[in-house]
Amino acid sequence: TEKEHHSDIDHWQMLAVAFGNELRYVPVKGDLTLDMEEYEASIEGAGLVCVVHTSNVLGVRNPIEDIIRIAHENGARVLLDAAQGAPHCQINMAELGADMMALSAHKMCGPTGIGCLLVNEETFQEMKPFMGGGDMIETVTLEGSTYQTNEHRFEAGTPRIAEAIGWKSALDYLGQLNLNEQHQRLLGIARYVADELRSLGMTVYGRHDDNDSSVVSFLHPTLHSEDFAHLLDARGVAVRTGHHCAQPLLNRLGISGTVRASFYIYNTMEDAEEFLTHLRDILERFA
């Protein structure tokens, strides 16, 4: 879709160049939702549907259930990018019916440089190794090799052991929390901040509906987003600026980047108030 992170666009484009695959993109409508009519009209003949669960720019959750149902009705498999969605709510891959689901540790209190791909059994049995070396082999001779039949056939070489241990600890911690309760608490903070930003003359990108994520992307009509980031950083406030690795979506919105405030389990309403206090001070001084 036009909402995808670059990581769900770039390599498909590389494969299209290498093997002639046809790529089709589902557009975003003016209300920031996907054009589901266009999706249904363009899915014929597709083999794989790749879709982000929740936009890392807008925080808007896509209608995943409908997307998966329509894909399966047309014989296509579904790869769900849950890097942004999984840290904020409990996602049951089996109930959704997704064939594959991708996660990233750094979005859920874990280390950088490690992620995972969950695959259902039917899809897993059809997947072949894509990288050679190390423990992914069963036997090796000078004439040829055979490969492990379990998940190890995809894990060539020395794995990221320290990162995996760190992620396990993070998942154990998150498992002690009620993520659905945390989601509602953080969504309340995001809604409050979004309303305050609008009252200060900001344009806020996102809806913050019940199923959406607690990220708030915004722009000031005159003060550049990078200036905001530096000025907030000097006050001890961390925000993200730029295109957020989602340039096609930003192009659709007609902008080059936003300021993004991301609220997670360690944030409180007091943090939000402090952020707004610093932001008001910046506006008084510079805008």
Indicate where each model-derived feature is located.
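Pyridoxal 5′-phosphate
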Residues: 1-287
